[in-house]
């Protein structure tokens, strides 16, 4: 298995409601800037505290599969010390509530 793989966010019920919930979570995140916020694709930039490095986080709605695919990557460097995974898992826990 890929060490960098992040499981999608699963949802049940209405896809539009799930998408709106995700949009609200990301929009309310500290140091997040929404770059693209469409009906099935969201791209946000998260700026790190301190040095201000930018991480790109993308979400894509897969309505048929009942999931939202996630991609999170640092723009600089190879190691992020788990910051991207921790951010996505924080979003996942808020999304699951």
Predicted segments, located by residue:
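Ser/Thr-rich, low-complexity intrinsically disordered terminal regions
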Residues: 1-97
């Amino acid at each position: 298995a890929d060490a960098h793989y992040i499981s999608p966010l699963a949802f049940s019920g209405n896809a539009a409601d799930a998408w709106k919930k995700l949009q609200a979570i990301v929009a309310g995140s500290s140091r997040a800037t929404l770059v693209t916020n469409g009906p099935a694709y969201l791209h946000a930039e998260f700026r790190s505290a301190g040095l201000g490095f930018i991480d790109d986080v993308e979400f894509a709605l897969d309505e048929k599969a009942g999931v939202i695919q996630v991609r999170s990557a640092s723009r600089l460097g190879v190691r992020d010390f788990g910051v991207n995974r921790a951010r996505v898992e924080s979003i996942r826990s808020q999304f699951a509530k």
